[in-house]
Amino acid sequence: MRILVSNDDGILAQGIRTLANTLHRAGHTVTVVCPDRERSATGHALTMHKPLRAEAVENLFEPGLAAWAINGTPSDSVKLGLDALLGERPDLVVSGINCGANLGSDVLYSGTVSAAMEGTIEGLPSIAVSLASRVRCDFQPAADFLVRFVRALEVQPLPEAFLLNVNVPALPESEILGARVCRLGMRRYRDQFVKRVDPRGVNYYWLAGEVIESEEAPDSDVVAVGEGCIAITPLKYDLTYEPGIGLLGARQWEKIFDPLAGG
């Protein structure tokens, strides 16, 4: 299988090296195209006002594995890889392994998820994979699971291209209690901007904060990971709120555009 691998933690991150090398050893043709530095929480941003540069990377991954570092975002990396760098169209796009969970509303900010979503936009099945810890970062169990997961998708391909958001609990493989297909949870944060002053007396701010503990639906990704299971959540780029179509459609919006209407 031809697989394009990207991430948002950058080319030097251990997560992408573990993922790409493990897929390569499993017999897949792997090409890495990812940011040249940390680009977490950049969402689906694209670089529009400066040129993108791609630098071939050697001696970082296993022999026979092609890799490129891009001076852009995760979405830039996948888009440039598909349109300019890869000789053949891949069968699959995989983004990760992220250091830290991407659960619930995290997916709206996540560069990891956005890199995979770019593959979906281009009509390719895509997977975003994250390790649900920023402290205990043994990526190998997540990489081994992904190899088995990709093998299962080869045997029984998805009927259409969509994104699978995979979150793996930071546990030894023997302690992971299976995998669940689930929906997005809430995952809200209590944000805090820490104000500081630089040597010139100018204020600057760091974004900090913590997760707000709240009741989650039992079929959510947040609950699955919290109970020691791998969470697999299908996602699509269509963000339409379907009930809103009916709610808004029942109103007489044409009056807004009628200059003869009262008001």
UniProtKB/Swiss-Prot annotation:
EC top class named in words: hydrolase
Binding site for a divalent metal cation: 8-9, 40, 98
GO MF terms held by the record: 3'-nucleotidase activity; 5'-nucleotidase activity; exopolyphosphatase activity; metal ion binding; nucleotide binding
Domain of life: Bacteria
Coiled coil: none
Alphabetized InterPro entries for the sequence: SurE (IPR030048), SurE-like_Pase/nucleotidase (IPR002828), SurE-like_sf (IPR036523)
Annotated GO CC locations: cytoplasm
UniProt keyword list: Cytoplasm, Hydrolase, Metal-binding, Nucleotide-binding
Reaction(s) this enzyme catalyzes, per UniProt: a ribonucleoside 5'-phosphate + H2O = a ribonucleoside + phosphate
Coarse class of the protein's main subcellular location: cytoplasm
Subcellular location: Cytoplasm
PANTHER family xref list: 5'-NUCLEOTIDASE SURE, 5'_3'-NUCLEOTIDASE SURE
Family: Belongs to the SurE nucleotidase family.
Identification of the protein by name: 5'-nucleotidase SurE
UniProt source species: Gloeobacter violaceus (strain ATCC 29082 / PCC 7421)
Upper taxonomic lineage: Bacteria, Bacillati, Cyanobacteriota, Cyanophyceae, Gloeobacterales
